[in-house]
Amino acid sequence: IIKLQKQDETAAIGLAEHYAQTISGALVRNEYHSAILHFYLRHLPKAHQRQALRFVKGWGMGNFRDEDWLRATKDDRRYPALVEKTLVALLSACEKHELRRLNERPPAILQKALDAYADNESLMRLWMKAKLAACKDNEALETLRCLIRKQQRFYLWKELADITPDEQLKLSALCKAILLQPKDEFLG
């Protein structure tokens, strides 16, 4: 799969899917197994994100190595750990009923990742959406407030306005979103 990706990416994706289907969650922890998941997540078309659910289920959520939890730094840039990428891809691919079910009984790996990568905005925003799907509005608000404290982004304030029941807070959050929004993106 690793060699084939340079010659024929589509064939390599198909072979990776066959590989995941064949091992079907069996315990396999090695660098090649992790490299296959990394390749699949990187090359999976956005239009086919739901396929990530099936692939990772076959790959095996219990197959992450200790190294897969570590972030990489290259050329003064930080890159997310494989676990982060995987969970973001999975949560992005989930539909509302799946997010609700996931929130009711979060797997241990998800809870560990939420604690380890609390600074990952994408992961935390997706987890907030899972809380909303499970009708845990107060928990979702608290998650969003934590994100806003760390990063003053206009879209976070907009999301706060969308989910808060307090009309005064809603108006304040919308005003803050407008103030923080880049001028070229403001459509008035």
Give each language-model segment a name.
Residues I1-L4, G14-E17, Q21-H97, A118-K129, ...:
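Amphipathic alpha-helical repeat scaffolds of TPR domains
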Residues Q7-I23, H48-D68, R100-L114, D137-R149, ...:
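Alpha-helical repeat scaffolds
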